[in-house]
Amino acid sequence: MNLNKYETIYILQPNITESENLILINEYKALIKKYGGNNIVVQHKGRRHLNYNIKSYYDGIYVQINYTASSNLVRILEKAMRLSQHVIRYMTIKNCHMNDIKI
């Protein structure tokens, strides 16, 4: 199985409490571990004003998760975020550093 480095950033509704935020983070970390992901690093980016409203919210709580996993896990994680009522937007990118590229 080919493992790649991914970075997922998601935005939570601004009315989420810190305890609800931690519950969501632990759910996503458990999901990543369950499907073979590792090297999980979570960064709280805090509450920020959005440039445009998303689902009638003008602020959001940003959370970033970096991890190593297969592409199948990314689909599973994004589906869980899509079904969550607290996540208003998410995005996953594959980290590809220049020194990893073979010419």
Swiss-Prot record:
Could you tell me where this protein is found in the cell? Plastid, Chloroplast
According to its UniProt record, which protein family does this protein belong to? Belongs to the bacterial ribosomal protein bS6 family.
What molecular functions are annotated in GO for this chain?
A: small ribosomal subunit rRNA binding; structural constituent of ribosome
GO biological process entries = translation
Q: Where does the protein principally reside?
A: plastid
Which regions form coiled coils?
none
Q: What InterPro entries does this protein map onto?
A: Ribosomal_bS6 (IPR000529), Ribosomal_bS6_sf (IPR035980), Ribosomal_S6_plastid/chlpt (IPR020814), Transl_elong_EF1B/ribsomal_bS6 (IPR014717)
Q: Which cysteines are joined by disulfide bonds?
A: none
Keywords carried by this UniProt record: Chloroplast, Plastid, Ribonucleoprotein, Ribosomal protein, RNA-binding, rRNA-binding
Task: Give the function comment from the record.
Answer: Binds together with bS18 to 16S ribosomal RNA.
Q: Which organism is it from?
A: Gracilaria tenuistipitata var. liui (Red alga)
Q: What is this protein called?
A: Small ribosomal subunit protein bS6c
GO annotations of cellular component type: chloroplast; ribonucleoprotein complex; ribosome
- Pfam families this protein is in? Ribosomal_S6
Query: Per its UniProt entry, which superkingdom is the organism in?
Result: Eukaryota
